[in-house]
């Protein structure tokens, strides 16, 4: 992966601290790109049962740096358009440009089931009422904001920079 096909390019990866975002970050860093990982919580950790390993953004950033990338971690709630614009402006200010945007942030589900195991604290993104008509508006809004609007806001924020670079 060290062909440097993307040397001099800067990649923005939302939701880049874990899972697929981590994979994108490592792959792009391996191709020579500098990487900005934007995540709601850079300190959150995810345990991968198959590896028995604790992974968090610091780990991914260190792995990308080991591949030769300049790395920037930005903690931001991308469901807020102004916060997204500020995160992208910071990225461009610190890394010089934004050439690649991977909108990977997402999460939360709405499942319509009669029986769902709810944690003791009651915090869940799962609709436990069983029917679509009973799903709370707040839950639908949160899922749409997280999975759709973060992508829209990110694209809207990077577009002016990308247009200016062409």
What is the role of each PLM region?
Residues 33-58:
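Conserved glycine-rich Rossmann-like NAD(P)H-binding loop of the short-chain dehydrogenase/reductase
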Residues 107, 119-153:
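Catalytic Tyr-X3-Lys loop
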């Amino acid at each position: 992966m060290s062909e440097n096909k993307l040397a001099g390019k800067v990649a923005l990866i939302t939701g880049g601290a874990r899972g697929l975002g981590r994979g994108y970050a490592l792959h792009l860093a391996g191709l020579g790109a500098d990487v900005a990982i934007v995540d709601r919580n850079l300190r959150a950790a995810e345990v991968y049962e198959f590896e028995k390993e604790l992974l968090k953004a610091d780990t991914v950033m260190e792995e990308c740096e080991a591949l030769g990338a300049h790395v920037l971690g930005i903690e931001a709630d991308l469901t807020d358009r102004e916060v997204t614009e500020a995160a992208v402006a910071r990225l461009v200010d610190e890394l010089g440009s934004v050439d690649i945007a991977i909108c990977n942030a997402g999460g939360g589900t709405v499942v319509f089931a009669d029986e769902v195991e709810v944690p003791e604290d009651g915090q869940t993104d799962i609709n436990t009422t069983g029917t679509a008509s009973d799903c709370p508006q707040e839950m639908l809004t949160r899922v749409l904001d997280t999975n759709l609007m973060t992508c829209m806001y990110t694209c809207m924020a990077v577009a002016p920079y990308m247009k200016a670079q062409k």
